Design a protein with these regions (language model features):
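Short, compositionally biased leader-like segments
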Residues: 2-27
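Short beta-strand segments
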Residues: 38-76, 106-107
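A short mixed-secondary-structure module that forms the rim of ligand-binding clefts
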Residues: 61-103
Length: 186
């Protein structure tokens, strides 16, 4: 939230007759990026503490809001303590979605990360993500136990991290790596 109590990224001004008008910028991600996020990707969440020391941990699932403005990643509370502490303290987050079989990679950054309990249906999202990731790395020769070890999280240990992407980058190896993505035209 902004100091004025409005969600970050929301702009207000007064029309001549004094009626407030709210304008939301277009979402930073569009159907192409959502399609990549929905694929069998590896999801890595990064944060930093007040001394600028980085922390990172693998997420165990992900979801994009219907309006494409918010991204949620699911994390194991017990194995992600440092990242979650950073996010609670400063809200700064970077998330990388990378498809192991193709190296297609998207990085999203935000400043408003919020740690929250999971919601009804989130456990199913996490389970589906695990099964898809097992298939993805299975095609690369890794057996199921590798994925289950990497993505180990029990329902009582899951937390959701919600954030608004404020910057997006194509991180797929090649000539466009590091290129910033523009907001999606509405």
């Amino acid at each position: 939230m902004s100091p004025a109590g409005r969600p970050k990224g929301e702009f207000r001004w007064a029309k001549p007759e004094g009626t407030p008008v709210t304008v939301n910028p277009p979402p930073l991600i569009g159907p192409e990026q959502v399609a990549l996020i929905a694929r069998r990707v590896s999801v890595i969440v990064a944060s930093r503490d007040s001394a600028h020391r980085p922390h990172l941990m693998r997420a165990v699932g992900r979801r994009v809001s219907a309006d494409l403005r918010r991204v949620t990643v699911f994390m194991s509370a017990s194995s992600s303590a440092a990242v979650l502490a950073d996010l609670r303290a400063n809200g700064l987050i970077a998330v990388v979605f990378s498809e192991p079989s193709t190296n297609r990679t998207l990085q999203l950054k935000g400043r408003d990360a919020m740690v929250a309990p999971i919601e009804p249906g989130d456990e199913a999202v996490v389970q589906t993500y695990l099964l898809h990731f097992i298939d993805e790395i299975g095609e690369l020769g890794f057996n199921e136990s590798v994925a289950r070890t990497m993505l180990c999280a029990t329902p009582g240990d899951l937390l959701a991290v919600h954030f608004t992407p404020e910057a997006a980058f194509d991180q797929t190896p090649g000539p466009k790596a590091g290129q910033a993505l523009s907001p999606v035209a509405g």
